[in-house]
Amino acid sequence: MSAMERLLDFAERTRLIETEDRAYARNCLLEAMRLDAPEENANAEAPLGDTMTEALNALCDDAVRRGVINDTGESRDLFSAKLAGCVTPSPYEVRARFFEKYRRSPEKATKWFYQMCRDADYIKVDRIRKNARFFAEGLEITINLSKPEKDPRDIANALKSKAAGYPKCMLCVENPGYAGRPGFPARQNHRMIPLNLNGESWHMQYSPYLYYNEH
């Protein structure tokens, strides 16, 4: 089974997409990979575990080999978000599912949204697992190893690029769906939940690197 089909299997299993969406999502992935048709006669591989990271990495490797993207950390991250975005529910659908669950249980709705962000690879589960943690009575010390170091080539590209001023910030409401650019992360797999708090409009979102539990 190809990395693309394993990714689609994972997305279907975690309900990021429905069975009826599979062909559409595949075509979105093919466009991103600059392929005309799916790979045939791929070697059999085990299904993905609890994240889509392995399949995304394999697709990025293939994209590098074929010259679709550069082999830098930032290029891979931008491309991974683009691929993950192909199997992430639309902002409207995410909000609809959240508030349907919220009417029955706000706690369950929040847990669902958190899990969806993990499944869609917005929360970088595999990277977070690399963090070093030390515990003492009433204290937890974390050494953050999950956020990748900047590649000098990526730093040079960011210096060459013009400041766009959009989105206004990395936490602003314009981010979901944004393709990213040198120095600014891609957000195709990012989703927010709108909330009304004391008569004001706010949005709930998670951090990709979870500096503390469900942050």
Where do the protein language model's features map onto the residues?
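Active-site microenvironments that recognize anionic phosphate/pyrophosphate groups
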Residues: 1-214
